[in-house]
Each structure stands twice: as C-alpha cells, then as structure tokens.
Amino acid sequence: MNENQRLLSVQNRTHLSVRQLAVFVLSLLMVGAMVLTNQRDNAVVESLVTPVPVMPVVSVDQRISTSWFCPGVPGNDGTISGSIIVSNPSDADFNATVTRLGVGVSPVVTAVTVAARSQAVVNVKEGIESPFISTIVEILGGVGTAEQFINHPAGNSVAQCANEPATDWYFADGFTGADSLDHIVLTNPYSDSTVVDVSFVTTESTREPSRLHGFVIPPRSVIALNMADEGARNEPVVAVEVHASAGKLVVGRSQHYLGDGRLGYTMALGASGLSSEWWFADGEKLDGSTEQLVILNPTRSDATLSVMFVNGANPDTQSEPASVIAPAGSVTLFDTGTLPNVPNGRYGIIVSTVGEPGVEAPGIVVEQVINRRVGNTVGTSVVLGAPMGAMSTVWVAPSGVSSGIDDAMLILNATPIEGTVTVSQIGPAGEVAIAGLESVLLPASGLVSIPVPAGISNGEIVVRATVPVVVQRMLLRGHELTGRSAVLALPTIPSPEVGS
C-alpha cells in the first residue's frame, strides 16, 4: 500500500455532532466508572485497551515510596546536557536516590535530600559515560515527582518519566527524513535480562527485523536503536512497537530533526498501551504553522475514528467531526489543514475510535506534529495526546513552565460545563496562586491559553480546575530558537473532588 492509500478518508459529516459532546463526555465518564467497578469486583476482561491512563500520573494514594523511570539522555555529545528535576511540594524534607544506567557500565547511584516546598536538580551525566543514560528516581514517600530535562543545541526538551516499566510501548510518529536521527531508547531497570520484539511501520510496509526479534537487553542497562540503521532510513514516518516477551522495560524516543520540513530536537516517553481516545489541548490553525495527527493502529482490525475540533464556540458555528479510517497494522497521516471547516486560531482535538454497538472500541495511539515556521527557520514539536482516563481536576508540572510568554500552558475543558482554573506555584510559602491566575474562566468544551508573567522563578506548577481538564505546556526551546516544545503536565488520578 502506498502513501496516498495510507492517508485517511475524510468525510464531511459523521455519527457524532458537536451538539452531542455532552453525551459523548458523559458516556466516557460512565465507561470509566464501569471499569473501576469491574476492577473492584476482580472481573477479568480481555481487551486491547488499557482501562487506566497509559501515561504517567500523580497518585493520591498514600505510599511508602514512589519511583519514576526517566527515558534517557544522549551521553556521548559534550554539547548536550541532561538533568533530572525532583520536586517536593510537601511541608517536610524527603530523601531520594537517583540511579543512572548505561550500557557496559555499572550503575551510578546518588543520594539526594529534597527540601520541603522546593526542587533538586541532578546532573544525569555525572560519573557515567554511555551513548545514552537513563535514570531511576526512588523517593521515600509518595508526594514527590520527577521529570527529565535535556539542554540540546537544536532545542531543549522536557520529557515525562514513567511510573513503572511495562511490557508494551508504542510510538505513532518517528522521522528519519534528511538523515534525521531517530533513536528508540530501551531501558531495563531490573537485575534480570529483558527480551523484546521490536517492529516498525512506515508508509509502505510493516517490518519485523530478525535482529530485533528476541532482542536481549542486559540487566540494568540502556540500549538505543538507530532506526535508520535498522532499515528505516529517510522515512517520513516510522511508527514503532516494542513488546517484551520476558521482563518489562521503559522506552523513550530521541529525535533530532535535520530537514525535510522538520527542525529541532525532542525526547519523549512512549505510550505504555493503547487507548480508544486521545485528547490534545493545543490544536493550531495559525499563520506559519502546519499540523498533522499521526495515528498508529497496531491491531488486526481497521478502526473508524472520529476527530472533533472544539474551541468553546457556539455549537451552531462549530465544525462537524471528521471521520477517519485507520487501516489495521498501519500508520495513518491526517493533515488537519486539509479540512476547510477547522476553526482558525487554537482549538482542542479529541480523537476517538468508534465501536459497533455492544462491542468495545479498539485502541490506537495518536501523536500530534506541529511545524512552526518563522522566516527561513522551522521549529518542530511532537506530543502524545492525553489518553482515556487522564482527564483530571488537578494537574502538576514538576519542572515548571516557561515564563514571560502568553501561551505557557493550554488548558482544555473536557466537559460541556463552564469552569474556572487556578494556576499556582510551589514555593517557600507552599502552594500560592500566581497573580492574575487565581480564577481564569474556562469556556464549556473550550480552551484557554495561560500567560505566565515574566520573572516567575523555577518551581513546580499546580493547576486546579472546577471541571476535568487536559493541561499541556508550551516551552521555550532555548538557544534563541523559534517555536515551542510541547509536553503534557501530569494528571492527578483519581481526579480529586473540587476543593479537596
């Protein structure tokens, strides 16, 4: 099948109208409630869709310790540095250990004390040499969070850290055009070997290299696969699936874009499962920007998708959702600019699979690629959407946000009910609302761009809303580069009641 055949089929109207958004959201909440009920009853249900968010979350449960598994930092280039930010929002100090892993080297362990209401920054590359270095953060107590930061000449990047290793990992997007560097970073944090099967999908075919079948990752080590060397050279899209047949692991993707419409650097954690819905808080139809949704359907059945664009406008003026066919075992490219009725400006995007009555909707993985052009240069951002079950009234950004810009955060209202949000920062006085952001109006089924004032010091950011929301950060890329890098904040799960 060629690239044109892989491109989606878009219809002008579909089964779901904007007027039905309330019913759509309520049905999702009912599904989540049923899943939780089944879990309590120990019911066993076979499904391709993981019933819990396939992304990192902040747990409200009391724990003796909390672990974070970070996806990796390039270690063999002196122009690139990396750090782990450990955040403590509580009123008491806590102790943590940061373990660095590489290939062919012994783990390096550092003990850290994080003072109350503050952060600690740990140099990833200190004391270890390896092509890629991954870290494990173990916190005594359940209140701390961690994120990874990479300072790269092609653009700085913040990556989420996983709550735990998993058997399956997915990336819908990947790019090796113009000899761009696409590394899949495999981290085995355990004392036993992990055995994986790695396959990838391009616009032309699905490939399962024999070298990557039964591929062994030694204990407590990190191995990076250069996808061009694995047979995916100069490909406009390289979707990757990693399955562990023995053990579990953490998988990240390091991308250095060198041309063919993309420039910059990103590092991201993969999706640890499939989801029947993906939410994006920063859709863009702006001068100089192009937007593409990259959809991986690794299942054996074709999937029908609904792609809804929401911006809080009058339902009578909202565009109808697009209907998309994602063929089985394929990657589908959806250029939102091809739809004439997509609203100008910024909007939220909801991608959901459509199941037959009485049949559970299949799972997919969706990433969003935005290229922002200013003059003769481009800045590329890639972000995985928020999966089913991730909507929450409380989100945290452990490493903070970029200040002095008018789009530091985009917040999408996941309900048809008007709400408000409060944006606070953790500091010496605890959690304190940022001036001007104490009560920001959030339109029903709409989104709001949050400007963070210049001069705000580094610190964990907390977003509290009166309705379930999705929160995405838009970060400066540093080095006087154009555009933004994008990463979600972390949802608190289960979603706290308003005022708790």
What residues fall within each predicted segment?
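Solenoidal tandem-repeat scaffolds enriched in leucines and small polar residues
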Residues: 172-185, 189-260, 269, 279
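Post-signal-peptide, soluble extracytosolic/periplasmic N-terminal scaffold domains
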Residues: 42, 52-56, 85-127, 134-154, ...
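Short acidic, flexible loop segments centered on an aromatic residue
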Residues: 83, 87-106, 185-208, 244, ...
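N-terminal Lys/Arg-rich, disordered targeting/topogenic segments
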Residues: 1-14
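Hydrophobic, ordered structural segments
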Residues: 118-157, 189, 223-261, 332, ...
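Hydrophobic alpha-helical membrane segments, chiefly transmembrane helices and signal peptide h-regions
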Residues: 19-39, 96, 240-242, 305, ...
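Conserved functional hotspot residues at active sites or interaction interfaces
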Residues: 20-83, 144-189, 248-298, 358-416, ...
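Intrinsically disordered, low-complexity Pro/Gly/Ser/Thr-rich segments with frequent PxxP/GP/PP motifs
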Residues: 51, 101-130, 134, 206-235, ...
